[in-house]
Amino acid sequence: MDIAALREEYTRHGLSRDDLNVDPFKQFETWFKQACESQLLEPNAMSLATASDQGEPSLRTVLLKYFDNQGFVFFTNYESNKAKQIEENPYVALLFLWLPLERQVKIRGKAAKISTAESFRYFTTRPRGSQLGAWCSEQSSVISSRQLLEMKFEEIRRKFAQGEIPLPSFWGGYRIVPHYFEFWQGRPNRLHDRFSYTLQEDNTWEIHRLSP
């Protein structure tokens, strides 16, 4: 299969310095709303890159659950590989890719666990099946079969058949506090528009156009 000729010409939008908000969180919010309004499949899907204390990288897709000017929050099992790497090295990167809009956003920052109370508030909004799934999945561990996983799900479902399902002690959220944003807009002839925001010591953001 010849994949060398697979390419698209990006022609939808341009991005100039005058288009940008001085606040990268507000700029992200604008683009995120446009991605949602375009009815893209899971516009909150983001690639999360972590690395161990030995520098070995890992990458996976997780779902952004909310964000504000304090950071970007996702939820996971605190015993998963990603959580173990964050414990060793809290510096991570995010990537949002919205191909139909010919856009991507890259974010670098530091991850930290949110409070149990904040995790609990989100956990109570999850569908009951997702709450049960959090209890029965020992994320990233080796299992012998899917049947074993489904049997454990039924066991947990019976255990919590009555009343509310409690928050697992091993499950919760992380907040990624950014120190760098990059907004990328595809353009014709691969002359893409790229702008970076870098956090300064006085908590202002320095904006630069980058070569594509």
From Swiss-Prot:
It catalyses: pyridoxamine 5'-phosphate + O2 + H2O = pyridoxal 5'-phosphate + H2O2 + NH4(+); pyridoxine 5'-phosphate + O2 = pyridoxal 5'-phosphate + H2O2. FMN binds at residues 60-65, 75-76, 82, 104, 139-140, 184, 194. InterPro entries: Pyridox_Oxase (IPR000659), Pyridox_Oxase_CS (IPR019740), Pyridox_Oxase_N (IPR011576), Pyridoxamine_oxidase_dimer_C (IPR019576), Split_barrel_FMN-bd (IPR012349). Keywords: Flavoprotein, FMN, Oxidoreductase, Pyridoxine biosynthesis. GO terms for molecular function: FMN binding; pyridoxamine phosphate oxidase activity. Its EC number is 1.4.3.5. Transmembrane segments: none annotated. Pfam families: PNP_phzG_C, PNPOx_N. Binds 1 FMN per subunit. Its cofactor is FMN. Substrate binds at residues 7-10, 65, 122, 126, 130, 190-192. Pathway: Cofactor metabolism; pyridoxal 5'-phosphate salvage; pyridoxal 5'-phosphate from pyridoxamine 5'-phosphate: step 1/1; Cofactor metabolism; pyridoxal 5'-phosphate salvage; pyridoxal 5'-phosphate from pyridoxine 5'-phosphate: step 1/1. One of its GO terms (biological process) is pyridoxine biosynthetic process. Homodimer. Belongs to the pyridoxamine 5'-phosphate oxidase family. Catalyzes the oxidation of either pyridoxine 5'-phosphate (PNP) or pyridoxamine 5'-phosphate (PMP) into pyridoxal 5'-phosphate (PLP). This is Pyridoxine/pyridoxamine 5'-phosphate oxidase. It comes from Rippkaea orientalis (strain PCC 8801 / RF-1) (Cyanothece sp. (strain PCC 8801)). The lineage of its organism: Bacteria, Bacillati, Cyanobacteriota, Cyanophyceae, Oscillatoriophycideae.
